């Protein structure tokens, strides 16, 4: 799931995109936190969509998602520990 210019989208692993009549906050409350994680203000990712996680400047992480054109998905310092714990499950 991602948000762009106040519009929320669902993107499948096959790359298809669908517009949702919802906010990311509402989506986050509805999805299973065991398999979905709020990466930042713009992205919620399924565990299987995460291709790579790299250390980035200022104690942040850079996440690469499968079938995603945005290559600079940054996770804030505040969420780094939560993301690492979530991935280690």
Where are these regions (language model features)?
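C-terminal output/interaction extensions
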Residues: 77, 81-89
């Amino acid at each position: 799931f991602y948000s762009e210019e106040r519009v929320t989208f669902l993107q499948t692993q096959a790359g298809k995109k669908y517009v949702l009549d919802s906010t990311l906050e509402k989506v986050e409350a509805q999805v299973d936190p065991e398999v979905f994680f709020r990466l930042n203000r713009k992205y919620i990712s399924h565990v299987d969509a995460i291709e790579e996680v790299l250390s980035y400047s200022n104690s942040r992480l850079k996440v690469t998602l499968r079938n995603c054109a945005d290559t600079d998905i940054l996770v804030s310092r505040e969420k780094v520990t939560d993301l690492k714990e979530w991935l280690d499950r």
